[in-house]
Amino acid sequence: MAAELDLERALVIGVASSALFDLRESDAVFREQGEERYREYQREHLDDVLEPGVAFPFIRRLLDLNDLSDRERLVEVVILSRNDPETGMRVMRSVARHGLDITRAIFMQGRAPYRFMEPLRMSLFLSANEDDVREAIDMGFAAGRVVGRAQPDDGDTDLRIAFDFDGVLADDSAERVFQSEGLDGYQESESALAEVPLSRGPMADFLEKINRIQGIEESKSLDDPSGYRRRVHVAVVTARSAPAHERAINSIGQWGLRVNDAFFLG
């Protein structure tokens, strides 16, 4: 029996094909030769497997966490694309050839599919396209741009996630104080409000879902302390320093969330 998917409980990620695969060659065809030649190119190369993109190792390691439960699907990844279904076929064939457990995709020719993030309860959207990321953020969704060149996927299973704090896990209200009142005013404000939690930011839901998976890992580790090694590690890396660090720690705890490590580097 297939594991059940509960969108309210699962960690659901939207990923653009530009983040998952290296599309530089086909994108160049689109830009330089136009849409019709691009469509022909994709048909001609339908069975040519796309090379992994920047987000590929991250997505693979997330999906691998589904082996922690036979009853429910812990992680679901959905491809969100401005391609039409025909040109998107190459993406889905490459997904299958790489052995990625991704079966859901939304292809909308030339249009942004972000409005489906909320009904699908997506905690994050990843893309290599800066404009797409900004558009998703402007619509109120958590989104991130993947940058650089893809690195070889070494097949490791460890998943290490680092979050900034202000404007990411938390809202940006403290950052606004810093901008308006300077460092001294900011430190004074954060010291006075050390026990008052900040409001949750755009990535807090993602951390909550990751924490749930970590809880399952903790149970596995307790049941098999010598045989199971935890894979997921979470850190906060922030420009905050003492005394402002206390409000960050207290906020995370009062939200009912946790991190393994914290780096206060202001």
Kindly give the residue locations of the regions a language model identified.
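Phosphate-coordination loops involved in phosphoryl transfer and adenosine-cofactor binding
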Residues: 158
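Glycine-rich beta-to-alpha transition loops that act as phosphate-gripper elements at the mouths
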Residues: 128, 265-266
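Alpha-helical substrate-recognition element adjacent to the catalytic core
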Residues: 2-111, 155, 165-264
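Hydrophobic, ordered structural segments
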Residues: 20-23, 94-98, 113-152, 169, ...
